Amino acid sequence: MYKLVMKKLWIFVLICFWPLSAHAWMAKVVSVTDGDTIKVYNAEQGQVKIRLYGIDTPEKGQPYGKAAGKHLSSLIAGAMVEVETVTTDRYGRTVGIVWDEETNINQEMVRAGYAWVYRRYCDKPFCSEWLLLEDNARSSRIGLWQEPNPVPPWEWRRRK
């Protein structure tokens, strides 16, 4: 029931804000770099590196870092996806929301317990919903939340 309600909510939001949304385009996923970065191919733009907007997953050297990448691969490896461009980051990567049909992949990574909501950068209205999904994953102890004290990747990177 919850999945159905969420799907309908996202369709409603997408329809309501479509004219206001960022540029969206179709592409084929050619590789998954890690849990929050992919490479896609689009005939107009060629190969493009995409950083998933609003989330941060464990780094490869952290517990659940490789698992986050594998989970993302299981969702979209080789798939045709829609990329909704939000911005470009300081590394020149496109930052966007990735959709596989009606599934918001960024949101799904949080729901499945493989990503934190990146509070520093997630400033869209739907980010509050993602925070609820993160809290649910934490309380259900799924994904990275199986660890007793998971270290957020931004803290882990700062320590390195």
What are these regions (language model features)?
Residues 2-16, 20-160:
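Small beta-barrel nucleic-acid-binding modules, primarily SNase/OB-fold domains
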